[in-house]
Amino acid sequence: MAKLSKDRLIFGLFLIVLIAIGEIVLTKLKLAAWPAFMIMIFFFEAHMDTKKAANILLGGLFGIANLILIKMFLDAAAPSLGLDLAKLVYILVFVYLIVALGEVVPILFNNYCFMFFLVAGLAAMTPAPNVFQWMAVEIVGGGLFIAGILCIMKILGAMAAKKAVKT
């Protein structure tokens, strides 16, 4: 069984402060918090690899933006195909493009794109959805969360270096 790590406990304290600040600011501004927090979760899932940050941010942004594209497609295709079939066609093409172009344009066509499209689609069913707001929160808030996490890591690194000098 693993032991409690002092570094993880300290990281956790800094992280909950970051989360609280993010939640308070977004709530005060009456902005949806979920896009920024999804970025945070995916950044952790990517083991805080800064090389994946652009794929997470831009893939997520593209996923949310697809709500605009599907609306345009449905407006054009639903009269002839019916709403359900038009929606299915769009989703099938969207998933196919993620698979087909995932290695060609991985910054946009990736799993983050698909997950943000799915969650944004569900969020769009709530009262007063605001896709453009979600996109802004995803990029700005998510980017700030990534920066905050990296800042926490630097602080912990500096603390460890200071401790190493003392011993």
Locate predicted features.
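Hydrophobic alpha-helical transmembrane segments in multi-pass integral membrane proteins
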Residues: 68-79, 123-135
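Interfacial loop-to-helix junctions that mark the boundaries of transmembrane helices
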Residues: 26-28, 78-86, 102-104, 132-137
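Pore- and pathway-forming membrane helices of multi-pass small-molecule/ion transporters and channels
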Residues: 30-47, 95-128
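A cytosolic-side transmembrane-helix exit/cap motif
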Residues: 51-62, 104-114, 129-140, 159-163
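Interhelical loops and loop-helix junctions of multi-pass membrane transporters/channels
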Residues: 3, 8, 12, 78-89, ...
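Hydrophobic faces of alpha-helical transmembrane segments in multi-pass integral membrane proteins
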Residues: 10-22, 54, 58-70, 86-98, ...
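Alpha-helical membrane segments and adjacent membrane-interface helices in multi-pass membrane proteins
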Residues: 35-74
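Alpha-helical transmembrane segments and their membrane-interface boundaries
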Residues: 1-51, 127-135, 143-167
